[in-house]
């Protein structure tokens, strides 16, 4: 199991948090995703044999947020 901390711009409310967490949790191989709105970060636990960081970034960007 691996962990990645992603910096995300544009998240400001509970809806943002829910949208990003849901998008990530729907990816096969992601075991948990937790958004911290205060610091604009997402902590993701995942199986790196099933999912790549680029797939997680794409899922976040598809929700309208920028991964920096």
From Swiss-Prot:
Residues that coordinate or bind Cu cation: 13, 16
GO CC terms in record: cytoplasm
Transmembrane segments: none
Highest taxon in the source lineage: Bacteria
PANTHER family in the cross-refs: P-TYPE CATION-TRANSPORTING ATPASE
Protein name in UniProt: Copper chaperone CopZ
Role played: Chaperone that serves for the intracellular sequestration and transport of Cu(+). Delivers Cu(+) to the copper-exporting P-type ATPase A (CopA).
């Amino acid at each position: 199991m691996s962990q990645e901390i992603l910096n995300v711009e544009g998240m400001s409310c509970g809806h943002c948090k829910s949208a990003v967490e849901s998008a990530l949790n729907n990816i096969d191989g992601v075991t948990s995703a937790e958004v911290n709105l205060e610091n604009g970060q997402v902590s993701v636990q995942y199986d790196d044999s099933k999912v790549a960081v680029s797939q997680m970034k794409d899922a976040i960007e598809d929700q309208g947020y920028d991964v920096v």
